UniProtKB/Swiss-Prot annotation:
Organism lineage: Eukaryota, Metazoa, Ecdysozoa, Nematoda, Chromadorea
An example molecular function term from Gene Ontology annotations: phosphorylase kinase regulator activity
Gene name tied to this protein: elpc-4
GO biological process: regulation of transcription by RNA polymerase II; tRNA wobble uridine modification
Family designation: Belongs to the ELP4 family.
Subunit structure: Component of the elongator complex.
Annotated organism of origin: Caenorhabditis elegans
Pathway the protein takes part in: tRNA modification; 5-methoxycarbonylmethyl-2-thiouridine-tRNA biosynthesis
Protein name (database record): Elongator complex protein 4
Function in brief: Component of the elongator complex which is required for multiple tRNA modifications, including mcm5U (5-methoxycarbonylmethyl uridine), mcm5s2U (5-methoxycarbonylmethyl-2-thiouridine), and ncm5U (5-carbamoylmethyl uridine). The elongator complex catalyzes the formation of carboxymethyluridine in the wobble base at position 34 in tRNAs.
Keywords (A to Z) from UniProt: Cytoplasm, Nucleus, tRNA processing
Length: 334
């Protein structure tokens, strides 16, 4: 929260309820959490039984930062982060015009089905969240060349090393530190991505709880937003409870199993359930409450990451009102 007298202007950020906030790069996710990410937030992405769908949210997050000149940092204990070479580029006005539906529509067939007159004025149900265009503002088929992203590339991956590196970045030229009053160095937002934090590869993994407490304290005193990805399917409950306690916003991406894929064919190209486990804590006094929580997500290299409302198909086996299959009196034997 901004102190009295503070006047901070950072590209790509706005002030709401005396809180500095910025976009996550995914319109549907912004809509779900109330419009934008609040500064100093820690977002926990639970990639349940999978480690491929959270990458789309990370790439959107980094792409938004690069577009506005924010500083970006990423660390992954398993391998060199692949997201650096796959960060999508921002769509231009020309790209949006090329994707518009052409004016000349094909002539309707005489035998084509028409909607009943009684439903002619009824609005169509929209499953999308966010802008009505339902188009991602970033093109995942075109990638940013030579993105300016800091990568934690130490030979020995340790949580202590990550924290010390982040402290150095925050204090460098005082660009990301919160300072009261006007004047001083120009401020900028730091976007941090910590991938696969649940992997027990770090030498000091047993100090994960201490690391998260220090990270949260650092984020509260800085212009910083942190994304953390993990897989709760293989993490012990006490360890996962520590991760949940440190996060301000917690989401879970649960992919469909084989039976659910067959059952939910009507959902099209949806890949799984989107569970919003916890709302942003930094705005708990006046938090945004989503109108619906039955959500699904789609992650593709063409559309990026989209969150939609889950609509169940009609029950065709049930009889229509007024046509119940009740036996008539003449068919009853006495």
């Amino acid at each position: 929260m901004l102190n009295v007298g503070d006047s901070v202007q950072i590209a790509g950020c706005s002030t709401k309820k005396r809180l500095l906030e910025t976009s996550s790069g995914c319109d549907s996710f912004d809509t779900l959490i109330g419009g934008a990410l609040v500064n100093s937030s820690i977002v926990l992405i639970d990639e349940y039984r999978s480690r491929c769908y959270g990458s789309y949210l990370i790439r959107s997050f980094l792409a938004e930062g690069l577009h506005h000149g924010h500083r970006c940092f990423i660390a992954d204990p398993t391998e060199d982060p692949k997201e650096i070479n796959l960060i999508p580029s921002r769509r231009t006005s020309t790209d949006m015009q090329n994707q518009e539906i052409p004016n000349s529509l094909p002539a309707e067939n005489e035998n084509s089905m028409k909607i009943a007159w009684r439903y002619g004025n009824v609005k169509q149900v929209s499953s999308s969240l966010g802008p009505l265009s339902n188009e991602n503002q970033y093109d995942f088929t075109k990638h940013v060349e030579n993105p300016n992203v800091d990568v934690y590339a130490e030979k020995v991956f340790t949580l202590k090393g990550i924290y010390e590196t982040l402290c150095q970045i925050v204090k460098e030229n005082e660009a990301h530190t919160k300072s009261g009053g006007r004047g001083g160095p120009k401020k900028n937002l730091l976007r941090v991505v910590l991938k696969n934090i649940d992997m027990e590869i770090c030498e000091d993994y047993k100090f994960l709880g201490r690391f998260l407490c220090c990270l949260r304290s650092l984020a509260r005193s800085s212009y910083m937003i942190v994304y953390i990805t993990a897989n709760s399917f293989r993490v012990p409950k006490p360890t996962w409870r520590i991760l949940e306690s440190a996060a301000d916003t917690h989401i879970q991406l649960m992919p469909f199993d084989e039976n659910e894929k067959k059952m939910f064919k009507h959902l099209g190209t949806a890949h799984g359930y989107f569970h919003l486990k916890s709302l942003p804590r930094l705005m708990s006094v006046g938090t945004h409450t989503p109108p619906i929580l039955d959500l699904i997500f789609e992650a593709s290299s063409r559309k990026g990451f989209q969150i939609r409302v889950m609509h169940l198909p009609p029950a065709f086996d049930e009889p229509a009102p007024g046509h119940q299959n009740t036996p008539s009196c003449q068919n009853i034997d006495f």
